[in-house]
Swiss-Prot record:
It comes from Trichodesmium erythraeum (strain IMS101). Zn(2+) 1 binds at H62, H64, H139, D210. HAMAP family: RNase_Z_BN (MF_01818). The gene is rnz. Its cofactor is Zn(2+). The active site is at D66 (proton acceptor). It is an enzyme of class 3 (hydrolase). It catalyses: Endonucleolytic cleavage of RNA, removing extra 3' nucleotides from tRNA precursor, generating 3' termini of tRNAs. A 3'-hydroxy group is left at the tRNA terminus and a 5'-phosphoryl group is left at the trailer molecule. Binds 2 Zn(2+) ions. This is Ribonuclease Z. Its EC number is 3.1.26.11.
C-alpha cells in the first residue's frame, strides 16, 4: 500500500500545491484508488508516475469544489485514452446528480461504465484483500472520512516442514498456506497455521477531511498505521477553524493521539501560511509535534509506503537483542 499526494492545498491551488487528491496504489493487483479529485488532478497524474489506466475506484469526501472539480475532466480523459475498464465512485448523495449533470450538459459520453454508490457510515466496500469503511465528519456540508483496512495474511509457508510431515505437494498446499485445517488421506488432521510463520497483520489507512475535531474522526482512525488528516489552520487561528468547521494542526494531532495511530500526515493547508507570512507551515508542524511527535507534513507528489509497523517493531527488537 503506497499513497501519493496529488494535491495538498485547501480552497485554491498555489504555485507549489494543487487542491485535494490522494492516490492509493495497490501494486500487487495493479490497481489505483483515488481519494478526492480537486481541479487539475488529471494534470497531476501527468506529472507523476501514476498510471490512470489502473484507476478503478474514487472516494469523494464531500462536494466542495476543491475536492470534486477535477472529476469531470479526469473521467473524460480516462475514456479518451486511459484504457480504463470501469470506475466505481463513492461519495455524498449529491455526487451522482453532479456527475450526471456534467455529462449531460457537456454532452460527454464515457467509453466505459461508471457506478456511483452513496456513502453511508459503515462498510461500503469489501473484497478478499481489503475493507473500506466510512464515517461522518463535522463540516459545513455532508462529509465522510474513509478507512481502508488490509486484511491479515498468513505468514510464510514452511514447505520443508510440510514435506517432513509426509504431506505431498499439490492442491492441498493452497489450503494449508491459508492456515486452514485439512484432512490427509491417512486420516491425520493438519492445522495449516502450524506450518505458517507469524501472520502479516493488515495495514490501516485513514483519510479525514474536511472536518473540525470530532468523535467520528477519532473512532474511524482507531489504531491506524497512517492517518492523513486536514490541518487547514494554525492553532492561533482556532476561532476561524471553528467558524468554518476546519481543523487546526493541534486538532489533527489530538485526533491522532486519541485514536492511537502510528503516524500522522497533515494536509489541506491554507495558502495564508505561504513563505513571507508571520506564521509558516513549519509552525503548524511544530504545533502538531508538540502533541503527537510522529507527525509529518504532506506536499504534492510525496509518495509514502505504509509500513507494517508490527514487522518494523520485530526487526528493531531483533537488532537490539
Amino acid at each position: 500500500m503506497q499513497i501519493t499526494f496529488l494535491g495538498t492545498s485547501s480552497g485554491v491551488p498555489t504555485r507549489s500545491r494543487n487542491v485535494s487528491s490522494i492516490a492509493l496504489r495497490l501494486p500487487q493487483r495493479a490497481e489505483l484508488w483515488l481519494f478526492d479529485c480537486g481541479e487539475g488532478t488529471q494534470h497531476q497524474f501527468l506529472r507523476s508516475d501514476l498510471k490512470v489506466s489502473q484507476l478503478s475506484r474514487i472516494f469523494i469526501t464531500h462536494m466542495h469544489g476543491d475536492h470534486v472539480f477535477g472529476l469531470m475532466g479526469l473521467l473524460a480523459s480516462c475514456g479518451l485514452g486511459g484504457n480504463v475498464k470501469s470506475v466505481t465512485l463513492y461519495g455524498p448523495p449529491a455526487l451522482e446528480d453532479y456527475l450526471q449533470a456534467g455529462l449531460r450538459y457537456s454532452q460527454t459520453h464515457l467509453a466505459y461504465p461508471i457506478k456511483v454508490h452513496k456513502s453511508k457510515p459503515g462498510v461500503i466496500y469489501e473484497d478478499d484483500e481489503y475493507v473500506v469503511s466510512c464515517a461522518y465528519l463535522k463540516h459545513r456540508v455532508t462529509a465522510f472520512g474513509y478507512r481502508v483496512t488490509e486484511k491479515d495474511r498468513p505468514g510464510h509457508f514452511n514447505v520443508e516442514k510440510a514435506k517432513a510431515l509426509g504431506i505431498p505437494p499439490g492442491p492441498i498446499y493452497r489450503k494449508l498456506k491459508q492456515g486452514e485445517f485439512v484432512t490427509l488421506p491417512d486420516g491425520r488432521k493438519i492445522n495449516g497455521a502450524d506450518l505458517c510463520g507469524a501472520p502479516h497483520v493488515g495495514r490501516k489507512f485513514v483519510y479525514c477531511t474536511d472536518t473540525v475535531f470530532c468523535d467520528g474522526a477519532v473512532e474511524l482512525s482507531q489504531g491506524a498505521d497512517l492517518l492523513v488528516h486536514e490541518a487547514t489552520f494554525s492553532h492561533q487561528d482556532a476561532e476561524m477553524a471553528f467558524q468554518r468547521l476546519h481543523s487546526t494542526s493541534t486538532m489533527a494531532a489530538q485526533v491522532a493521539l486519541a485514536a492511537g495511530v502510528k503516524h500522522l500526515m497533515m494536509t489541506h493547508f491554507s495558502p495564508r501560511y505561504a513563505p513571507g507570512n508571520s506564521v509558516l507551515l513549519d509552525d503548524l508542524l511544530q504545533e502538531a509535534r508538540a502533541i503527537f511527535p510522529n507527525t509529518d507534513m504532506a506536499y504534492d507528489f510525496l509518495s509514502y509506503e505504509i509500513p507494517r509497523w508490527n514487522e518494523v517493531s520485530q526487526l528493531l527488537a531483533k537488532a537490539r537483542s
